[in-house]
Amino acid sequence: VQLTNRINRIQTSPTALVISAAEQLKAKGVDIADFGPGEPDFPTPDHIKKAAIKAIEENRTKYTPTGGIAPLREAIPAWHSRELSSNYSPKECAVTVGGKHAIFNAICVLVQAGDEVILPAPYWVSFPDIIKYAGANPVIVQTRPDSGFSAKAADIEKAITAKTKVVIINSPSNPTGGAVDGAEFERILALCRKHNIWLMADECYSHFVYDPHKPFSIASAKDSKDHVIVIGSVSKTFAMTGWRIGYALAPEPLIQAIVKIQSQSTSNPTSIAQYAALEAMRGTMDTVPPMLAEYTKRRKRIVEGLRAISGVSCEWPAGAFYAFPNISAYLGEGKNSLAKTCTELSKLLLEKAHVALVPGEAFGAPGFLRLSYATSLERIDVGLRRLENFFAHAEAAV
């Protein structure tokens, strides 16, 4: 089958491939310590589920406006204002089929062939391919473990050219958990103002940050609106990944363009899911602190466990629910090497140790592995024991 150059520029999500391989082994009865999925293991809160049931019972199952039902387009800016001190109106909000869809739509209306998008690495797996699909080129700016994988304005400035149209900042970050502090974020915003560039702030993990960090949005900065696009989602904060509701907050002309492209692709997000999201936005936030408390325990367990493995180093994530250890000591051609690449090593770990994780190459970070600790302490302990045993008996394992 002859496919377009556009589709040939992108690849299937590497995380989806890892999940698929792990599921195949699970189907054969193999017990897998699964650190692959990037989603909360908590259920959607009951009050949100009940709102969806009520919507079904009230027959709210028809088409809705493409950009979302009016109450939700009012509730999202109001929630964002309460939680993150921004100031958006309903006309500056578009509801999308998940946060990824908001990113896709925004990139597609902002860039064209030959444009550049600055992307700090390690990056979320879908960013480069969305940029390429839109015809633009990702310009990668490396972050460093010793700075907590936090993007720096000075590094971004060096990458800006006349072709730069967007800078993407995902904070807290998937895959590293790195977070950009408010002062640094404002320096990045100042750069974007200076060069007339859009700053896309992916805030999908905004409420999962660890002391001393606090939830932050660059949209709270003075006069930020003209250069900022906020991307958000109910997926992580409210454990609603499968409901597929995200949003964009931006100046009205950009929102109108996002709604236009959505009108010719998905049309409206699922009506029932929108009413569930409406309850999430209007209802209690009491379910978030217990989730964060549990992630805090898991973070401590997994980072300390990884650091106890000889040859492995791991920074403390500032947010999200991922550990991102450096395992480069076990890669290459040397006598202690287990594989040439992280991708090869992750396959070995799945096949030999029955541990599923995502290789760093997927995130533009060879030499690293991503482990999601959105799983129980008991399963974290099982996985850590298997990893420790694998690396301790490396020659036998290979």
Residue locations for each model-derived region?
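Conserved PLP-anchoring active-site segment centered on the Schiff-base-forming lysine
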Residues: 109-131
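Generic structural signal for small/hydrophobic residues in well-ordered secondary structure
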Residues: 18, 35, 52, 76, ...
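Active-site phosphate-binding strand-loop segment of PLP-dependent enzymes
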Residues: 139, 143-216
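PLP-dependent enzyme catalytic core of the Aspartate aminotransferase-like
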Residues: 78, 82, 157-158, 335-340, ...
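A short helix-loop-beta submotif of the ANL/AMP-binding
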Residues: 133-139
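Conserved core segment of the aminotransferase class I/II
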Residues: 221-296, 300-309, 390
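N-terminal small-domain helix-loop-helix segment of the aminotransferase-like
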Residues: 2-98, 105, 134, 280-283, ...
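Conserved glycine-rich beta-strand-loop-beta hairpin in the small C-terminal domain of fold type I
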Residues: 278, 293-303, 314-333, 367
